[in-house]
Amino acid sequence: MSNKLISQMGLPSSLANVFSARNILTAKDALSLPEFDLMALLDVDRDQVRTAVARISEIACPPCRTALSLMEDRALTGGYLPTRLLGLDRALRGGIPFGALTELVGPSGIGKTQFCLKLALLAALPSSYGGLNGRVIYMDTESKFHSTRLIEIGRSSFPHIFNSEGMAQEMAGRIIVLRPASLDELTESLQQIQLIILQHDVKLLIVDSMAAILVGENERSTTGQKQHSCHLPLSFLKSLAEFSQIPIVVTNQVRSQNNYEVVHYPFQGIQWAHAVTIRLIFEAHSGQRFIKISKSPTSPAIAFPFLVKSSGIALLSDEGLEVTGSEMSTIRCEGLNVLVEGAEPFPHLGC
C-alpha cells in the first residue's frame, strides 16, 4: 500500500502537482518525511501538509480484514492463472496469483518469453476452455514478441480451438502489444494502462522485459537517478496489481562479474527482490533447463526440469527437486549455449 501513487489519491490538483514536481510520488515518499521537511519542500503551510498527509495515510493504510473475508474473496475471484504445467501449478497452489507481481528471471535464451507467450494465450482463452476470457497487455521492450510463434504455441497446445475457423485471429486479437523504447515511454504507457484495464477487460499484464529498459537508462544516470528510475515503475506495477487484482508478470535479466562466471545474479537489486511476490528462476545446469521457485509466500523452494517444444514450455517431470541453502537464490548458467543449439528447431525459441 505504501507504493500507491499520490497522483491517484484525490488531492487537489494544484497540491498533487507540487508533490510530483518535488519527486514525492508515492505514499511512502510522503510519509517518510517529517512534517516540517514537507512544508519546506512543497512550500505550503502546515495545515495543507497535515490535510495532505491525513488523506495519504487514509488511502495508503489497508483496511482491517478477517482471515475469513480474505479466503472468501480468493474463492470468489479464482485467485490464480494456471500455467498448465501441472507440477508448477501444484507447487504454486494454483498458478500465477492475481493481484501480485510475479518475476521471471534468467539468462537470455532460457525460455522466459516462451513462458510469457503461453501465459498470454491462457489468459485470452474462453472460460469454457479454462482461460480467463479477457484481453492481455504485452509490453515488449526487446522486440521478442512474435505473432507467428504465438499462433504456433496455440495450435500445438489447443488444436481443437485454433484449428477452428477464425479462432486463431480472435485469440491473437485479444493481445495488445506495446513497445516502449525508453523509460519515459514505459512510464507513460504504465500510467495509461490503468484506464485500459478497466475499459477493455484486461486479465493479464506482461512486461518483457523491465531490465532491458533500465539497462540503457542506468548507463546515462547517476546513482540516485538509477534508484529513482527503478523505483517509479516498480511502485506503479505493485499498486496496479493491488488495484486491478489481475496477475502481473515481469521478466528480468541476469548479470555476472565477468564472462566466465557460472553463477549469475538478477539485474535488479535487493529493492526489486523484496517487491515481487513470486520469483521464478530460469536456469541451466547438469545438461538441463530448470524452472525454480525461488520466492513465494505459500510455496516450497523447488525446481522442475523443462524443455521448450512447439507447444511452449513442457516439464520433464511434475515431481520437483527440493532446493536448499544458497541454491534458492543463485542462478546457474552452465552449458546454456549447448542447450540452445541442441533445442528443437523452432525459429523463435531464443527468448
Please give the residue ranges for each predicted region:
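Amphipathic alpha-helical transducer elements in NTP-driven molecular machines
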Residues: 82-85, 98, 113-114, 144-147, ...
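Hydrophobic/aromatic beta-strand patches that form the interior of the parallel beta-sheet core
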Residues: 102-104, 137-139, 176-178, 249, ...
